[in-house]
């Protein structure tokens, strides 16, 4: 049972996920809206869904008849605040002197707001929606998302750069358009910047950001209401799913002898959101703790692995690239049986990205996370040249959700496996679930497999055969089996 009393003649009502119409009555000069539902069926939540999807029915009500009306309400709260403040003007001049270009000015202003203005929300009374004056925020050196957004927009406007506060929903995201227009649809404020024909969505509350405008990490909140912008309705932040992260992994397994341990070297380069995650981790955890976590992860696959030193890292803040280098020793890597030597190859780069949902027979799309790309190159350096028979043709597995490509190659004692994964969208649509699961089964075959070669010390004539192949390769100008 739900009962609403209001004196507003503009009250609007909407039900989502269920056909429902309230009873309307007059009660002591007020309008009454009454809802009653009986024998409501149980709802089972699939889980693992993106924020805008919900299996539950809900109702929405508002006194606003359009998003333009909400924008007008917000514009009145944000207008006329602090453009000519002496402190704001002085700060803008300082940033301008430090900047090599307008693009550099934008990121310097952003990093100032992020790192020099402490995040603190005192959302009481009118300050639950009205931002504080930029000069007040500069004086006190703290502010919430509204305060930071307006300060950043004000600093950018001082440089003649078009910028506006933008209301977004971190909870509903793309689902905000399903509800009625209302200020209550939003719970966060960021800054929209129009620069050189592109729209940038900057968040003054984020930390650990670095790089230029096109290197920054970001969150796709789906739709935004840009306060005071010429387009006063909801705007889709990114018309096409943007690539939120990229991770490039290079692994090298170095063997000195088939009877000796191998050295595993791993170099991982993180971009955009992924770089910010690593920057946070390495600034807030000890290297020993990170080393222990990494070692526990690899220990799930290599039982005789030990770390050689602690992970090393390089933070390229100019390009927002964070590189981590690790070194391990693996004992008992090679297995021998009769005249054969074999070893396991683990392609671990994608384990945390591609998973099967806990509920396969779903009623809602399966959420994978923001679109991203991962590349992996693995080199296995044998202790001597071997004969390794491979299918060296590239293999591509693709469906509406993802694209996975891999290839095997061997040359001069080095086995190389290259692979890449592109997540094209954040959700697996219901109609694509079967193809996603089938593709994942096929892809997982590339994550663990065995390489087998003849033991050069046991097989008669093996070394002579390798010498002959090498001479033929030279004579043929690069013959390669």
Language-model segments: residues:
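A sensor for short, sequence-defined functional sites
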Residues: 1-481
């Amino acid at each position: 049972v739900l009962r609403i009393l209001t004196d507003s003649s503009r009250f609007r009502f909407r039900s989502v996920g269920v056909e429902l119409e309230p009873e309307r009555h007059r009660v002591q000069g007020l309008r009454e809206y009454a809802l009653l539902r009986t024998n409501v069926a149980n709802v089972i939540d699939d889980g693992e869904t993106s924020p805008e999807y919900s299996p539950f029915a809900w109702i929405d009500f508002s006194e606003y008849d359009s998003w333009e009306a909400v924008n007008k309400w917000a514009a009145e709260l944000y207008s006329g605040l602090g453009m000519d403040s002496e402190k704001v003007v002085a700060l803008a001049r300082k940033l301008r002197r430090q900047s090599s270009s307008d693009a550099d000015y934008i990121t310097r202003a952003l990093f100032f707001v992020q790192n020099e203005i402490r995040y603190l929300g005192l959302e009481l009374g009118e300050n639950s929606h009205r931002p504080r004056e930029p000069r007040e925020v500069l004086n006190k050196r703290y502010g919430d998302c509204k305060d930071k957004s307006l300060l950043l927009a004000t600093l950018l406007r001082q440089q003649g750069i078009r910028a506006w506060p933008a209301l977004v929903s971190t909870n509903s995201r793309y689902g905000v358009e399903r509800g009625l227009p209302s200020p209550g649809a939003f719970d966060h404020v960021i800054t929209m910047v129009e620069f050189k024909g592109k729209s940038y969505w900057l968040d003054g509350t984020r930390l650990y950001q670095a790089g230029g405008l096109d290197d920054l990490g970001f969150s796709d909140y789906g739709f935004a209401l840009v306060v005071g912008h010429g387009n006063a309705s909801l705007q889709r932040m990114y018309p096409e799913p943007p690539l939120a992260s990229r991770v490039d992994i290079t692994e090298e397994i170095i063997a000195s002898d088939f009877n000796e341990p191998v050295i595993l070297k791993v170099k991982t380069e993180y971009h955009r959101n992924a770089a910010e995650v690593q920057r946070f981790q390495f600034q807030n955890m000890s290297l020993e703790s990170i080393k222990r976590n990494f070692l526990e992860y690899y220990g799930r696959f290599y039982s005789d692995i030990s770390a050689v030193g602690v992970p090393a890292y390089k933070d390229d803040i100019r390009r927002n690239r964070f590189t981590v280098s690790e070194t391990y020793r693996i004992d008992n890597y090679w297995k021998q049986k009769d005249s054969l030597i074999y070893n396991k190859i683990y392609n671990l780069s994608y384990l945390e990205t591609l998973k099967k949902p806990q509920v396969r027979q779903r009623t809602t799309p399966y959420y994978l996370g923001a679109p991203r790309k991962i590349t992996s190159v693995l080199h296995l350096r044998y202790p001597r040249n071997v004969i390794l028979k491979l299918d060296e043709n590239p293999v591509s597995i693709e469906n509406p959700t993802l694209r996975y490509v891999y290839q095997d190659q061997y040359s001069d004692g080095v086995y190389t496996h290259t692979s890449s994964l592109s997540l094209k969208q954040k959700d697996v649509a219901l109609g694509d679930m079967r193809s996603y699961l089938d593709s994942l089964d096929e892809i997982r075959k590339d994550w663990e497999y065995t390489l087998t070669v003849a033991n050069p010390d046991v097989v008669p004539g093996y070394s002579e055969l390798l010498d002959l192949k090498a001479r033929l390769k030279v004579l043929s100008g690069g013959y390669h089996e």
